[in-house]
């Protein structure tokens, strides 16, 4: 079991129960899933780019990504409905906790010119979204085998009812928010 999951059960639950005055342990917000999304717009011209992006995402997450397709045709972007334009992975359970631990302890500190993550990226329901400009911050990616530096979106979905609860949950995990 991931250390972060044990830390959540032992420390974070107690801390949040006292902070928000919950009656039951089940009221305490928890991390439900983490979604990684990589939009590869250049895949329209070269299908190989999407395969490389999917391989990178599989290495980062430890799970085979789902290829996302365009929902509707957009002439300005030269895409048609059904074209493969990205890939995504939804992590839950053990893999989610392991990825979350790697994200906080290894990947985020490796971001160039890192000054902390924005605390304003909550969606109003306690879910947090962040963008990563380079996939090479993850140790699973071999820098020499990267064909192109691409970014990805990371969404942390929680059971929190408000942004304050979600922020307190992530802060309890020592999430590096900007001061």
From Swiss-Prot:
Q: Does the keyword tRNA-binding apply?
A: yes
Keyword tags:
Ribonucleoprotein, Ribosomal protein, RNA-binding, rRNA-binding, tRNA-binding
Q: Name one GO biological process term.
A: translation
Record carries keyword rRNA-binding: yes
SUPFAM superfamilies to which the protein is assigned, alphabetical: RL5-like (SSF55282)
Q: Which domain of life is it from?
A: Bacteria
The terms under GO molecular function for this entry are: RNA binding; rRNA binding; structural constituent of ribosome; tRNA binding
Family assignment? Belongs to the universal ribosomal protein uL5 family.
- Assembly notes: Part of the 50S ribosomal subunit; part of the 5S rRNA/L5/L18/L25 subcomplex. Contacts the 5S rRNA and the P site tRNA. Forms a bridge to the 30S subunit in the 70S ribosome.
Q: What does this protein do?
A: This is one of the proteins that bind and probably mediate the attachment of the 5S RNA into the large ribosomal subunit, where it forms part of the central protuberance. In the 70S ribosome it contacts protein S13 of the 30S subunit (bridge B1b), connecting the 2 subunits; this bridge is implicated in subunit movement. Contacts the P site tRNA; the 5S rRNA and some of its associated proteins might help stabilize positioning of ribosome-bound tRNAs.
Stored HAMAP family: Ribosomal_uL5_B
Name by which UniProt lists this protein: Large ribosomal subunit protein uL5
Q: Which organism is it from?
A: Yersinia pestis
In the UniProt record, the gene name given for this protein reads rplE
